[in-house]
């Protein structure tokens, strides 16, 4: 670095400064009871940790993957970057469409460096530990239904320590308003109700007027 040049920010600093404008995506593999290989595609927003899209296919391809971006990325949000690995599914044509059609700058991870897509890698591990490790998958439709319910729970009912702890969905941010109110005053007027998730594998709790 020459004298007078500004030092380049670290990757961690870049991600922290642009988190709400970055999405990351990845595939994970799930195996059914009949040993059929299914592929789960995930898109996550780094800033909120919210899962923007999740879908399943037995035959992943570039065109199918591009369609998932069309379904998962809202026009209301101005995303600028997408992180993905060097899987052959992410073809040059797909990346070109992400640049031209979505206005995204593609950030490729280095070869054989899963930690460079750490947000997705952690999400994949969470899905396995909290959901799929407890399930016997029957087929593609069954897996899709399980993930649909779990993603809803992950986004709207599961606290994340990295968020404060908080919950990814904007619709649930109003819970923060209750922090200034004492627990005793809330409990005197309401009762706690429980809602089972995935047949009782997890539960969500909420206040209900007494």
Across the structure, where does each feature detected by a protein language model lie?
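Charged DNA-binding/catalytic regions of mobile-element recombinases
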Residues: 1-210
């Amino acid at each position: 670095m020459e004298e007078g040049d500004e030092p380049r920010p670290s990757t961690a600093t870049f991600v922290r400064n642009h988190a709400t404008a970055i999405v990351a995506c990845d595939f994970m593999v799930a195996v059914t009871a009949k040993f059929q290989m299914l592929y789960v595609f995930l898109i996550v927003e780094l800033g909120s940790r919210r899962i923007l899209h999740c879908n399943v296919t037995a035959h992943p391809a570039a065109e199918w993957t591009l369609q998932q971006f069309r379904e998962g990325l809202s026009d209301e949000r101005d995303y600028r970057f997408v992180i993905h690995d060097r899987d052959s599914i992410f073809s040059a044509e797909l990346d070109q469409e992400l640049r031209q059609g979505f206005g995204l700058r593609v950030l490729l991870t280095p070869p054989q460096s899963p930690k460079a897509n750490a947000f997705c890698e952690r999400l994949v591990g969470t899905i396995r530990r909290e959901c799929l490790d407890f399930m016997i998958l029957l087929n593609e439709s069954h897996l899709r239904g399980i993930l649909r319910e779990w993603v809803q729970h992950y986004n709207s009912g599961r606290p994340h320590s990295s968020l404060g702890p908080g919950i990814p969905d904007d619709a649930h941010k109003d819970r923060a308003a209750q922090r200034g109110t004492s627990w005793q005053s809330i409990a005197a007027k309401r009762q706690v109700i429980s809602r089972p998730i995935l047949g009782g594998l997890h539960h969500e709790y909420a206040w209900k007027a007494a």
